[in-house]
């Protein structure tokens, strides 16, 4: 059975996560405030960041950078900026 939450990113009610995707208090906040749709948006941004900045998840500093960008995107309304990337026009 799906849960409905008020999504911080989308600013509307949406389907919530099925389980906590991230550890600790931040993970609890994501579970309670971030919808599946918004999490999918973040995953796309995260993949771009990892690829364009050549981040390694084995590197503690790279993981910290990714977590900071995730917080900015999910909770502060700031889009991920990747130098040299131009989004496709619709």
From Swiss-Prot:
Keywords from the UniProt entry: Iron
Protein name, UniProt field: Probable Fe(2+)-trafficking protein
Organism of origin: Pectobacterium atrosepticum (strain SCRI 1043 / ATCC BAA-672)
GO molecular function: iron ion binding
Keyword Repeat set for record: no
Any single biological process term in GO: cellular response to oxidative stress
Pfam family, one: Iron_traffic
Physiological role: Could be a mediator in iron transactions between iron acquisition and iron-requiring processes, such as synthesis and/or repair of Fe-S clusters in biosynthetic enzymes.
GO cellular component: cytosol
Top-level division of the source organism's lineage: Bacteria
SUBUNIT field: Monomer.
Family: Belongs to the Fe(2+)-trafficking protein family.
PANTHER family noted in UniProt: FE(2+)-TRAFFICKING PROTEIN-RELATED
NCBIfam families: PRK05408.1 (NF003817)
